[in-house]
Regions:
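Topology signature of small-to-medium multi-pass alpha-helical membrane proteins
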Residues: 1-139
Length: 139
């Protein structure tokens, strides 16, 4: 039963298009990270690991990162600033990985492009979502 003295619930706002795009990029990245963790689990069963303890720790951290990125996506859809800021940090980390894939002895330009393009789209979308949230904020 509701309290007659309590204020009415805030109206539900639909996320901006930019927030939806940013959240979609984050969800796809979270799924990719989860697949990477499953690949690491398979590497243990194939015997491709030197240290079981290190491999297990890396798997746990990878799954935790997948959950964190997925939570950034959910928070972005709910117009929470911490989700957008966490998403931007994630995109910057992905860009750093793309730069590493582009340079060095074992450079792989196509992989760098596959990583960099969604990260740039994600940064743009999350930045635009933050701008839209600022415009729609009560003053």
């Amino acid at each position: 039963m509701t309290d007659p003295e309590s204020p009415p619930p805030a109206p539900v706002q639909r996320p901006s298009r930019a927030a939806s795009i940013g959240a979609l990029v984050l969800i796809v990245e979270a799924l990719g990270i989860a697949v990477l963790a499953l690949w690491q689990v398979l590497a243990i069963f194939r015997g491709d690991t030197v240290s079981l303890a290190s491999a297990l720790a890396l798997i746990v951290l990878t799954f935790l990162f997948a959950v964190a990125v997925a939570s950034f996506a959910v928070a972005t859809m709910r117009s929470r600033s911490w989700g957008r800021s966490g998403g931007v940090v994630t995109q910057v980390l992905v860009l750093a990985i793309a730069l590493g894939a582009l340079t060095g002895q074992y450079a792989h330009p196509f992989l760098a492009l596959v990583l960099a393009v969604p990260a740039v789209i994600g940064i743009w979308a999350l930045w635009a979502a933050a701008r839209a949230a600022g415009r729609n904020a009560p003053r």
